[in-house]
A protein has these predicted regions:
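Glycine-rich "HGGG/HGxG" loop immediately N-terminal to the catalytic nucleophile
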Residues: 63, 114, 128, 137-151, ...
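The serine-hydrolase catalytic nucleophile loop
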Residues: 109-121
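Non-catalytic accessory segments flanking enzyme active sites
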Residues: 17-94, 99, 289, 298, ...
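Alpha/beta-hydrolase
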Residues: 3-18, 28, 196-296
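Conserved hydrolase catalytic core segment
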Residues: 122-129, 167-229
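Active-site loop/oxyanion-hole signature of alpha/beta-hydrolase fold enzymes
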Residues: 97, 137-179, 205
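Short beta-strand element of the alpha/beta-hydrolase
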Residues: 100-108
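C-terminal subdomain of alpha/beta-hydrolase-fold enzymes, centered on the catalytic histidine
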Residues: 250-415
Length: 415
């Protein structure tokens, strides 16, 4: 008998809250240099102290928890080949349109399912409308952790695909950024009969090659980069040279950094806060927004250290991987899934347009003058607008999901 989803309520124990308060009260902070720009060295001491103080005294997790519980949260179990059953937490917002388009939204690190929340009201009743499924990936949020080694991109993709199948969505479309880019690309490689189209806001691609993409290679050779593309290459170079140290640590020795993330809320705060600042386009974070994002990691079912293991497993190919959609493979041509690209100037990887078009049959592109890495949070109107244009009656992906145009109105559907 296959498992069925059940409603889920986020409920952090009083003991966990007390433990957080005790750890914050006992925190030891480092000194810092007398530098004019503290951000060059990492998260500034004054900012981290302010946030830690707010987290200990003034921040209302119970209020944030209640807000998260207003979402249609569910829990189910999926089985991934070679691993023990996994408890998957997910948000499942169903539109009133009976034939709404099933959309799988996949988050990354240091994001979570919370990133979908601003999209939900825009996609529920739009034209077209979407049934939105936003899981906490295994090792993230309120999904369970993976205890065995070798849980690679193939297995993250399998978990998400099996969730969609369990919900009755034999065909669906996807949206993702950060690890959501890689996971949804892996889904397109593994399950092209089910994944009909993808929209991504992280664009990890390489220059077109004559043998693989002759027309794109010719365009790349003949036409100079635009000013926006030159700025994008500068942004990409900045990230590689000045912003990617976390990546090297997490993809080589995730366990080592895990001790700090699991034991010290201040370490977790500084580690993530730096990214929220550096990876956005001057987004006006409130302190409570930041603390809610970080609290989801601190109170996560598997613990904050588990989330960084995806970096290691994605590049160390496991004997359990049979399809092998590695990071390298996901950055190459995927033939069977129509693709939409959203370009933002402060994304971490901003390659020239011809590079992005090497990823697959690109049928839709948008370019926004402002925005960064967390597009669904910074620019929800852009992401929702892209999806509605891409799948509209005049869009390139109209009726791409069999029997689900997104337009007809029916009785309120039930899970």
């Amino acid at each position: 008998m296959s498992p069925s989803p059940s409603p889920f309520t986020i409920s952090v124990s009083d003991e966990a809250l007390d433990s957080l308060q005790n750890k914050l009260s006992a925190a030891t902070f480092p000194d810092e240099l007398e530098a004019p720009n503290q951000w060059q060295y990492g998260a500034p001491l004054a900012d981290v102290k302010r946030l830690a103080t707010r987290w200990q005294d003034g921040y209302d997790w119970r209020g944030a928890e209640a807000k998260l519980n207003e979402l249609p949260n569910f829990m189910t179990q999926v089985e991934v080949d070679g691993f023990r059953p996994i408890d998957i937490h997910f948000v499942h917002q169903k539109s009133e349109a009976e034939r709404a388009i099933p959309l799988l939204f996949v988050h990354g690190w240091p994001g979570s399912f919370i990133e979908v929340t601003k999209l939900l009201p825009l996609l529920k009743s739009g034209s077209p409308a979407f049934h939105v499924v936003a899981p906490s990936l295994p090792n993230f949020g309120f999904s369970s952790g993976i205890k065995e080694p070798g849980f690679s991109l193939q297995h993250y993709a399998e978990a998400c695909h099996k969730l969609m199948k369990q919900l009755g969505y034999d065909e669906y479309v996807t949206q993702g950024g950060d690890w959501g880019f890689y996971v949804t690309r892996a889904i397109g490689i593994q399950y092209p009969d089910s994944c009909k189209a993808s929209h991504v806001n992280l664009i990890r691609a390489h220059a077109p090659e004559w043998k693989k993409n002759p027309l794109l290679a010719l365009q790349h050779k003949l036409f100079p980069y635009s000013d926006a593309e030159k700025n994008g290459l500068e942004r990409s170079a900045w990230f590689e040279n000045e912003g990617s140290g976390y990546n090297l640590q997490q993809r080589t020795k995730p366990q080592t950094i895990g001790y700090a993330l699991a034991d010290s809320p201040v370490a977790l705060l500084a580690w993530i806060y730096e990214k929220l600042h550096d990876w956005t386009d001057s987004y006006p974070w409130t302190d409570d927004e930041i603390l809610t994002w970080i609290s989801i990691y601190w109170f996560s079912a598997a613990g904050p250290a588990a989330s960084v293991r995806i970096y290691y497993e994605a590049i160390h190919v496991s004997p359990k991987a049979t399809v092998i959609p590695t990071r390298v493979r996901t950055e190459q041509w995927v033939p069977d899934v129509k693709l939409g690209l959203a370009w933002f100037p402060k994304e971490l990887s901003v390659p020239p347009k011809t590079w992005g078009r090497t990823l697959g049959p690109v049928v839709y592109e948008s370019e926004t003058p402002r925005g960064g890495h967390f597009a669904a949070w910074e620019n929800p109107d852009v992401i929702a607008g892209d999806l509605q244009k891409m799948f509209s009656k005049t869009g390139p992906c109209y009726r791409i999901v069999k029997g689900r145009s997104g337009y007809d109105r029916g009785a309120r559907a039930r899970l």
